[in-house]
């Protein structure tokens, strides 16, 4: 069963009444009864608990008068901070064991009581910016709370100071520094309240409010850190190390560090927004949803909306306020520094976005890059095209540095470019790259109506573009030049990969002809005799029976760089003689190094048949 606050209050009142009645029944008089209550530990525990209940009731009454009903976030923050304050109070009791008394406990309870109102005032002022309606009663309550808290903090600071001066160092040092820190918090809340008030009185949004709030937070955190530092030094000289102040001191240092970094990063982000982020034109706004998600208002050209590197558009003043606290996109949470390094410059992005918004992509007739070679090296051309197209949907330019727009394939695309999906790679020998089937080779004897000899599509027409648009498409900035160099490097890698695969294919499939035997039939002999005399012969050398490999390939694209790499990566075959691949001067292929009478007879028949079918040319007719 959960114990409610009402049950605890009722039980405390009943226990207190029973304790007091018992003391008066035993002693019959007022003074002996008070002495009896003060000497009994059980009676003092009941009275202490009743005092805490009375403080709680007073807090609830003042809270309902000054703040009304608390929001869920305010109640949660108050509960968390109260538990931490109670634990710190218990640690403070261990430090001041000699000063422990009823007055000491009452002072700590009063300090916790005033701290709760400071926390509520801080949360309530922060809610001003998110509240749709600010009434006059709210202003009266806040001004009353801030004035009362400032007066109480000043009074207790001065009381602790004069008590330390007259009576020497005591536990009043703790209360003096605690109320001084609370006075700094009251100053911070007052500054935020005045800034919010000034912002509410302006018909338009106040752009510099976030800057003042950030600098005010930096100043207050610096004051808090200085106060905690002085308090730790004084406590080390008077008593011992204040263990109960470690957590708030660490929080103050961390808040100061965060505020300092926010000031630096916000200034960098605002400078980047003013100098590098492009301004969105009216055509782009009309082609997209022109609602700023920060202020939920329509964006116009007069408000100078800015486009982030992730292609999201917001008001300039909204981004300025947003960058005071964090340097990410409000929509996708992308870091603006990472996006800015991979995005295009302002001029290129603006020109490409205008072309895309007008519905006229500059490269409408350009097919995808190497459509007949992409699947040979495992490049997902379709997926890449879909990704680029998705990134540019709705008139947003993609992240490519000089804004290349990829158009879908034309409807009159030749059939030789409409290839089937790439098949699965074939398993090759161990240690080699997986082999892919070669592309279909057009037949030289194809019919005129077939599409194997179709011409590729012509060059696109750029006559309808102006000089400025062509310059924007060209991309003369540093990012565009680096992108073009990278594209040429990729082309070289693709061509060299094709050369390596062709060498590997030639190495694992050597050209060998079958050795004819004496039992060959007459049909096989006639078929073999029809081979022309210009076929090159493969003359094997007296090398060991190891597989014959071709020499290291030489790249036509990189000079000596690729050749050196291939020479180091190709196994050396200098241990044995290399095979000769040059055409032989003989008119017939050499079949075997061992000759038999049957083989000589077959050879003579072939020579006679070839001479009869292909007579030598007559020099007189030339």
Curated annotation (Swiss-Prot):
PROSITE patterns for this protein: ZF_RING_2
Signal peptide: 1-23
Stretches in topological domain Lumenal: 24-41, 121-141, 192-215
Record keywords: Endoplasmic reticulum, Membrane, Metal-binding, Signal, Transferase, Transmembrane, Transmembrane helix, Ubl conjugation pathway, Zinc, Zinc-finger
EC numbers, comma separated: 2.3.2.27
Cytoplasmic topological domain: 63-99, 163-170, 237-622
Biased composition annotated in UniProt, kind: Low complexity: 526-538, 579-596
Transmembrane segments: 42-62, 100-120, 142-162, 171-191, 216-236
Reactions catalysed according to its record: S-ubiquitinyl-[E2 ubiquitin-conjugating enzyme]-L-cysteine + [acceptor protein]-L-lysine = [E2 ubiquitin-conjugating enzyme]-L-cysteine + N(6)-ubiquitinyl-[acceptor protein]-L-lysine
CDD domains, A to Z: RING-H2_synoviolin (cd16479)
Compositional bias (Pro residues): 436-445
Gene3D superfamilies according to UniProt: Zinc/RING finger domain, C3HC4 (zinc finger)
Enzyme class: transferase
Compartments reported by the entry: Endoplasmic reticulum membrane
Pathway membership, UniProt: Protein modification; protein ubiquitination
Biological processes per GO annotation: ERAD pathway; multicellular organism growth; proteasome-mediated ubiquitin-dependent protein catabolic process; protein ubiquitination; regulation of gene expression; regulation of Notch signaling pathway
Organism superkingdom: Eukaryota
Similarity comment: family membership: Belongs to the HRD1 family.
Domain notes per entry: The RING-type zinc finger is required for E3 ligase activity.
Physiological role: Acts as an E3 ubiquitin-protein ligase which accepts ubiquitin specifically from endoplasmic reticulum-associated ubc-7 E2 ligase and transfers it to substrates, promoting their degradation. Component of the endoplasmic reticulum quality control (ERQC) system, which is also called the ER-associated degradation (ERAD) system, involved in ubiquitin-dependent degradation of misfolded endoplasmic reticulum proteins. Also promotes the degradation of normal but naturally short-lived proteins. Protects cells from ER stress-induced apoptosis.
Record note on quaternary structure: Homodimer.
Protein name: E3 ubiquitin-protein ligase hrd-1
Organism: Caenorhabditis briggsae
Lineage, highest ranks first: Eukaryota, Metazoa, Ecdysozoa, Nematoda, Chromadorea
